[in-house]
């Protein structure tokens, strides 16, 4: 192959130049030789068969030669040197589509595909093209919107499925050419940076469409030139360029040119799986982004290409400026070097831009409907909502403040003529108001910026926030339709050249096809009539074409040919405006209908001439309120009259009007000094003599005060009267000063009338303030001595003697004088220790007395001595006891068979235990007579089980304290057992287990299943309930107290469960216990019957786990059950109660007597359910592991609850079975590898692992009152109990501690 080597050698200097730039250049020469590609179409003209009409490709052959030249740069001490060497050639030959079409070299891979993929498609295999979303067909030549048309033009061609239809597809090369006669040589140049340490991201690939020669044009089909797809796999930091070097055909030979550049990016290329981050819409002055990102994660291209201004993961970055310069006609969207997609689009591949579906981004149009448009989106808010500041969510409208609306503002800035109805500021200022609010806030002047801010639609219109529609148009431009009649209708642009200049590319508009090189990326477009929607502001214009449905945007101040942007067709469905905007007609009914909607208006409204909105009928044009009498306010469907001052509203058959108000009909309107004269719209007051008109609102006639004139009464006091005045002489204590006034006489300055005391002058008189011990005389003009002894409130417990200005006290015996010497206080003799020895000293007035405690007497008046009751009365405690004296009392020591009475002062016969009486649960309860557990029971049955007292008719004998001598005497075998003297075994009385379930019935296990055990009982509750030992019943578990049960929802507790209400469209996931969106819902793997066999599948968030039945154990992954390899690896088998019955409600009954069994042992006997959860046993013979020889045990211990002699102890039998097991207070359980000690409930193993010790629940589990709220916790053997605090007792009906009533 000398030709290719020579071509390669010719390019070596260029590659050395690239190496001088610090890059590694790899030059690959591709010799693409295609031979004998041809075929025919049955039924087609003969003339077309020679051209290779559209039959299937009969055979194909190509040959690729790779001649690499490897260059590298070496730098030392600032001096760099380039060195290149020739690599070994590689040749690839493919024939009939069966050979390998891929070659791999060091750091690169080249794929040659002869299939011509059109419209930006990529050849993914030898017989398939990977098409963009808007095209289909085998060669991506059919638009997705229709079967015909596209880049290849209309007419016969390929169908959507890719099968050949009537027509012709030219071959890739003319038929009959050979390898030597015609070929094209291209150079594929891969430029890469030197690799760094470690392995980088996976390799990228670049695809190129290489033309082999000119195409053919026919009347029916416009075919592209013969092409071949070349794909180069290269490192991600590399760039790929393709150069055409030479061609053996002299006509098509051309100098080396740059073809299909693939520029090297300025930053490392992202991996195939693009990262997700936070999208921000707002920016701060000194920060790249705000503090409130959109919810969820998005890709950078989706964020920055649509609504975002900044994006980032751990750090926020501003979105880069778009370098978009325009995209050409419909079909493949091809951009120049460094070009970006337009706003609202992202790059699909190297040749296509795809619309960004903003509605799929989380957080867009929350609480509203999102409509995706090509390059934008639209938010439609429901009634009562409007778009928020971020333009991405609908927020509820806040009610605006309503206040007075004033029709007039005076020059003195006073508000006048308020309307009777309170209005919002916008509704006031946009209609007839001049000022608004309690502070008389002026409305902005019409035409100013402030007026446009609150009244954007002008005078007479206001914004209905529930109808606001926001539409994104182009480069983040927004239009808010506030027209009262709806959005403006689109206007038809004139098509004359004088009004609309044609674009520069006139050939494409006229549909003329040119044969241009592939590098120019030109396509054919047929012209169609255009209809342009022109917004009111200079936003980019939206041009729509009927076929194909494309959109073109024009930026302001630029010619259409430079700013036009064509976007790939997007399917748009018809929008039901009546459904999306429920109040679109206002006061009317929206009627949908083709092509648009119409409005049927309510009474009082009329349809706008454009029939897009219902407007109110303005009744005020006829001046129904009367000229000059009031202001007519038009309202929705009616009108109101706001009458001026002096007029009133009149409602008659003709409507509302303003009539004159006769103010003079109101009595005393002008006061008592005048009379009223009525005028139209006002009135006037005329005053009588002696009165004058007062300037007030309303004006009245007021009296003239003649006494203000000093000359009215020169020798006396002037007294004003209505309409006149009167002169009066001065009173005693006053002197005339002339001018009609009297002046007070100061008596205190003329002498000392108040000695001993102080004189105080008063108007017309004076007053004496006397010293202590003195009081004013009856006339108040002197001071007299006070006799304090006559008052009787001084010198208590003493004798009083009066002195001038004071008094003296002489105290009686047992009293002493107080500190203020005003009375006598008692002496507390009890403060002296010897006053009352051995008793209680009680102080009295003037003396004291000594009280001795019971059983003592007073000796000598100051000492208490014990009384010996036994010596004084020898008959005490007889005849069944002896008296024993105590300090202050005595007790009886009773004979055998007798017991002391409750007061310890007598002896009574001990009740025999076989007597049957009532058993009481709570002896301390205030209503303990109602706490009867059972009747007709013996004292042993009551006190040896659950009883706290035993007796008849509320005469209760307390049960002996547990572990006391009396308890062991009554219950020798402990709790849960009773003696039966009628049955003996070798002289020893038999012990019978107390069946608490039968004895007390439902009193001890309400809402549950009571199961008798030996000893004691167990209460099994349904799922969702727990057993309350204080209330002796099953109580519903409030799952809502645990917030993790219903995350992101509203939890509602139910009996036995709970309900989690989620906000649609979210649904509740029981596995994750939270409300999740449909995309986040967990897949329940346990729905597969084969999961976890033979065990139970437990679904987990995003996974599941297996609970295996012994002897099966979970596998290493936890998602299957396996048999252990050795007996030592088998899981220990758990033992529990075995049930003989299991109902349809899932409740078990009839526990089998005897010790607890494993699941297999229970189900292999006669069990139907196992465990506290009533796990069902499998059907008989359905894969059972039961041995055939196993049968139900008939031992006496298993079948009868009656135990002769002592019941077998677990620890004794364990020691007999295994010498190596020691288990005190527990039982030995055989396990693989040896027996272990297992403790009963309420016990735990100690450090030696051989003894079961009681768990102190009150100390370990009662933190913060979790066990006994507001009660005292008392630990018991294996359990605990809650006891009410002092002064409280438990209420039987409710089980709560209530204050104890005193009797």
From Swiss-Prot:
Molecular function terms, GO-annotated: calcium ion binding; transforming growth factor beta binding
Any one cellular-component term (Gene Ontology): extracellular exosome
GO biological process: bone mineralization; bone morphogenesis; bone remodeling; chondrocyte differentiation; lung saccule development; negative regulation of bone mineralization; negative regulation of chondrocyte differentiation; positive regulation of bone resorption
Post-translational modification: Contains hydroxylated asparagine residues. Two intrachain disulfide bonds from the TB3 domain are rearranged upon TGFB1 binding, and form interchain bonds with TGFB1 propeptide, anchoring it to the extracellular matrix.
Family, per entry: Belongs to the LTBP family.
Protein's UniProt name: Latent-transforming growth factor beta-binding protein 3
Disease named in the record: Dental anomalies and short stature: A disorder characterized by hypoplastic amelogenesis imperfecta, significant short stature, brachyolmia-like anomalies including platyspondyly with short pedicles, narrow intervertebral and interpedicular distances, rectangular-shaped vertebrae with posterior scalloping and herniation of the nuclei, and broad femoral necks. Dental anomalies include widely spaced, small, yellow teeth, oligodontia, and severely reduced to absent enamel. Geleophysic dysplasia 3: A form of geleophysic dysplasia, a rare skeletal disease characterized by severe short stature, short hands and feet, and joint limitations. Radiologic features include delayed bone age, cone-shaped epiphyses, shortened long tubular bones, and ovoid vertebral bodies. Affected individuals have characteristic facial features including a 'happy' face with full cheeks, shortened nose, hypertelorism, long and flat philtrum, and thin upper lip.
CDD domains in alphabetical order: EGF_CA
Biased composition, class Low complexity, residue ranges: 529-540
Domain of life: Eukaryota
InterPro entries, per database record: cEGF, EGF-like_Ca-bd_dom, EGF-like_CS, EGF-like_dom, EGF-type_Asp/Asn_hydroxyl_site, EGF_Ca-bd_CS, Growth_fac_rcpt_cys_sf, NOTCH1_EGF-like
Originating gene: LTBP3
Cysteines joined through disulfide linkages: 113-123, 117-129, 131-140, 279-303, 289-316, 304-319, 359-370, 365-379, 381-394, 405-428, 415-440, 429-443, 430-455, 578-590, 585-599, 601-614, 620-632, 625-641, 664-676, 670-685, 687-701, 748-759, 754-768, 770-783, 789-800, 795-809, 811-824, 830-841, 836-850, 852-864, 870-883, 877-892, 894-907, 919-942, 929-954, 943-959, 944-971, 997-1010, 1005-1019, 1021-1034, 1040-1051, 1046-1060, 1062-1075, 1086-1097, 1092-1106, 1108-1121, 1138-1162, 1148-1174, 1163-1177, 1164-1186, 1258-1273, 1268-1282
Glycosylation sites per record: 89, 349, 845, 936, 1275
Keywords: Amelogenesis imperfecta, Disease variant, Disulfide bond, Dwarfism, EGF-like domain, Extracellular matrix, Glycoprotein, Growth factor binding, Repeat, Secreted, Signal
UniProt keyword rRNA-binding present: no
Signal peptide from the UniProt entry: 1-43
Subcellular location: Secreted; Secreted, Extracellular space, Extracellular matrix
UniProt tissue specificity: Isoform 2: Expressed prominently in heart, skeletal muscle, prostate, testis, small intestine and ovary. Isoform 1: Strongly expressed in pancreas and liver.
Taxonomic source organism: Homo sapiens (Human)
Known partners and oligomeric status: Forms part of the large latent transforming growth factor beta precursor complex; removal is essential for activation of complex. Interacts with EFEMP2.
The protein's role, per its UniProt record: Key regulator of transforming growth factor beta (TGFB1, TGFB2 and TGFB3) that controls TGF-beta activation by maintaining it in a latent state during storage in extracellular space. Associates specifically via disulfide bonds with the Latency-associated peptide (LAP), which is the regulatory chain of TGF-beta, and regulates integrin-dependent activation of TGF-beta.
């Amino acid at each position: 192959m000398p030709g290719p080597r020579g071509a390669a050698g010719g390019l070596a200097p260029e590659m050395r130049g690239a190496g001088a730039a610090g890059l590694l250049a790899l030059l690959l020469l591709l010799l693409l030789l295609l031979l004998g590609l041809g075929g025919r179409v049955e039924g087609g003209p003969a003339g077309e068969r020679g051209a290779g009409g559209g039959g299937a490709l009969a055979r194909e052959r190509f040959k690729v030669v790779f001649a690499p030249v490897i260059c590298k740069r070496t730098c030392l001490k600032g001096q760099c040197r380039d060195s290149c060497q020739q690599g070994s050639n590689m040749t690839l030959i493919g024939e009939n589509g069966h050979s390998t079409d891929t070659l791999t070299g060091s750091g690169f891979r080249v794929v040659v595909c002869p299939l011509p993929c059109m419209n930006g498609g990529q050849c993914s295999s030898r017989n398939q093209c990977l098409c963009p979303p808007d095209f289909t067909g085998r060669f991506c030549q059919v638009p997705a919107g229709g079967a015909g048309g596209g880049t290849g033009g209309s007419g016969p061609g390929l169908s959507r499925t890719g099968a050949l239809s009537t027509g012709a597809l030219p071959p890739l090369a003319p038929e009959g050419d050979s390898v030597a006669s015609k070929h094209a040589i291209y150079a594929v140049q891969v430029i890469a940076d030197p690799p760094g340490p470690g392995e980088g991201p996976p390799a990228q690939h670049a695809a190129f469409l290489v033309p082999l020669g000119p195409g053919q044009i026919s009347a029916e089909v416009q075919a592209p030139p013969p092409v071949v797809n070349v794909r180069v796999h290269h490192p991600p930091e590399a760039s790929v360029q393709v150069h055409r070097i030479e061609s053996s055909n002299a006509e098509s030979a051309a100098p080396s040119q740059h073809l299909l550049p693939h520029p090297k990016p300025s930053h490392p290329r992202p991996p195939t799986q693009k990262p997700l981050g936070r999208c921000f819409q707002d920016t701060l002055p000194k920060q790249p982004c705000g503090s409130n990102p959109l919810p969820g994660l998005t890709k950078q291209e989706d964020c920055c290409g649509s609504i975002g201004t900044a994006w980032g993961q751990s750090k926020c970055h501003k979105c880069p400026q778009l370098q978009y310069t325009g995209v050409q006609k419909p079909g493949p969207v091809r951009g120049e070097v460094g070009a970006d997609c337009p706003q609202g689009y992202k790059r699909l591949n190297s040749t296509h831009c795809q619309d960004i579906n903003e509605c799929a981004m989380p957080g867009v149009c929350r609480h509203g409907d999102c409509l995706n448009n090509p390059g934008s989106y639209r938010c439609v808010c429901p009634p009562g909502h409007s778009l928020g500041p971020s333009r991405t969510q609908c927020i509820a409208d806040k009610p605006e403040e309503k206040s007075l609306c004033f029709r007039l503002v005076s020059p003195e800035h006073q508000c006048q003529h308020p309307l009777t109805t309170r209005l919002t500021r916008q509704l006031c200022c946009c209609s007839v108001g001049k000022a608004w609010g309690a502070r008389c806030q002026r409305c902005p002047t019409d035409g100013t910026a402030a007026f446009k801010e609150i009244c954007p639609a002008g005078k007479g219109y206001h914004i209905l926030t529930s109808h606001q529609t926001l539409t994104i148009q182009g480069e983040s431009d927004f239009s808010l339709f506030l027209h009262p009649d709806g959005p403006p209708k689109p206007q038809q642009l004139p098509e004359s050249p004088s009004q609309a200049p044609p674009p520069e590319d006139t050939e494409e508009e006229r549909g003329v096809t040119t044969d241009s090189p592939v590098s120019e990326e030109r396509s054919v477009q047929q012209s169609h009539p255009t209809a342009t929607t022109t917004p009111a502001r200079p936003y980019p214009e939206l041009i729509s074409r009927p076929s194909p449905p494309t959109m073109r945007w024009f930026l302001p101040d630029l010619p259409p040919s430079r700013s036009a942007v064509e976007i790939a067709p997007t399917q748009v469905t018809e929008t039901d405006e009546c459904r999306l905007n429920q109040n679109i007609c206002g006061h009317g009914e929206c009627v949908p209908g083709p092509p648009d909607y119409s409005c049927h208006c309510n009474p009082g409204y009329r349809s706008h001439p454009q029939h897009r909105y219902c407007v109110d009928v303005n009744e005020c044009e006829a001046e129904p309120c009367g000229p000059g009498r009031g202001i007519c306010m038009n309202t929705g469907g009616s009108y109101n009259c706001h009458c001026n001052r002096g007029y009133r509203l009149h409602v008659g058959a003709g409507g509302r009007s303003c009539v004159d108000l006769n103010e003079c009909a109101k009595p005393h309107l002008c006061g008592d000094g005048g009379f009223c004269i009525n005028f139209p719209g006002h009135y006037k007051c005329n005053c009588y003599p002696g009165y004058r008109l007062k300037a007030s609102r309303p004006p009245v006639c007021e009296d003239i005060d003649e006494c203000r004139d000093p000359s009215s009464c020169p020798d006396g006091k002037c007294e004003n009267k209505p309409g006149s005045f009167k002169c009066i002489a001065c009173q005693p204590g006053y002197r005339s000063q002339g001018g009609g006034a009297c002046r007070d006489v100061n008596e205190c300055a003329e002498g000392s009338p108040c000695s001993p005391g102080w004189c105080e002058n008063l108007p017309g008189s004076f007053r004496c303030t006397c010293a202590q011990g003195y009081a004013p005389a009856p006339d108040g003009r002197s001071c007299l001595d006070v006799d304090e002894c006559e008052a009787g409130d001084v010198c208590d417990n003493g004798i009083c003697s009066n002195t001038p200005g004071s008094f003296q006290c002489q105290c009686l015996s047992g009293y002493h004088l107080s500190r203020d010497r005003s009375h006598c206080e008692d002496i507390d003799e009890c403060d002296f220790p010897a006053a009352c020895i051995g008793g209680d000293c009680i102080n009295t007035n003037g003396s004291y007395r000594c009280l001795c405690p019971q059983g003592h007497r007073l000796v000598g008046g100051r000492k208490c001595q014990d009384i010996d009751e036994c010596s004084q009365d020898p008959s005490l405690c007889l005849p069944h006891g002896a008296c024993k004296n105590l300090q202050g009392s005595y007790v009886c020591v009773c004979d055998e068979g007798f017991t002391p009475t409750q007061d310890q002062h007598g002896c009574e016969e001990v009740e025999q235990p076989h007597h049957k009486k009532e058993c009481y649960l709570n002896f301390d309860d205030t209503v303990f007579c109602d706490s009867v557990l059972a009747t007709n029971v013996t004292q042993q049955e009551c006190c040896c089980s659950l009883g706290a007292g035993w007796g008849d008719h509320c005469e209760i004998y307390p049960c002996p304290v547990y572990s006391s001598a009396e308890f062991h005497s009554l219950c020798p075998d402990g709790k849960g057992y009773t003696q039966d003297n009628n049955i003996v075994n070798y002289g020893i009385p038999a012990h019978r287990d107390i069946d608490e379930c039968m004895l007390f019935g439902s009193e001890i296990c309400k809402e549950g299943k009571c199961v008798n055990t030996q000893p004691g009982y167990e209460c099994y509750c349904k799922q969702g309930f727990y057993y309350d030992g204080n209330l002796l019943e099953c109580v519903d578990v409030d799952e809502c107290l645990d917030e993790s049960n219903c995350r992101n929802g509203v939890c509602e507790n139910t009996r036995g469960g709970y309900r989690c209400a989620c906000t649609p469209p979210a649904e509740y996931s029981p596995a994750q216990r939270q409300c999740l969106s449909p995309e986040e819902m967990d897949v329940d793997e346990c729905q597969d019957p084969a999961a976890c066999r033979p065990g139970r599948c437990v679904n987990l968030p995003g996974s599941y786990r297996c609970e295996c039945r012994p002897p099966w154990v979970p596998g290493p992954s936890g998602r299957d059950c396996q048999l252990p390899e050795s007996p030592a690896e088998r899981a220990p088998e758990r033992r529990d109660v075995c049930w003989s019955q299991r109902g349809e409600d899932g409740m078990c009954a009839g526990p089998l007597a005897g010790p607890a069994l494993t699941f297999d042992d229970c189900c292999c006997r006669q069990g139907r359910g196992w465990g506290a959860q009533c796990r069902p046993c499998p059907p008989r013979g359905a894969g059972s592991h039961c041995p055939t020889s196993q049968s139900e045990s008939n031992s006496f211990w298993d079948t009868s609850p009656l135990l002769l002699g002592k019941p077998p102890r677990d620890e004794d039998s364990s020691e007999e079975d295994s010498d190596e097991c020691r288990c005190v207070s527990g039982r030995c359980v055989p396990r693989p590898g040896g027996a272990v000690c297992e403790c009963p409930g309420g016990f735990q193993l100690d450090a030696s692992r051989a003894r079961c010790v009681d768990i102190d629940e009150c100390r370990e589990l009662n933190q913060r009152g979790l066990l006994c709220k507001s009660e005292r916790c008392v630990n018991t053997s294996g359990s605990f109990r809650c006891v009410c605090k002092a002064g409280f007792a438990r209420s039987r009906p409710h089980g709560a501690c209530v204050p104890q009533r005193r009797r």
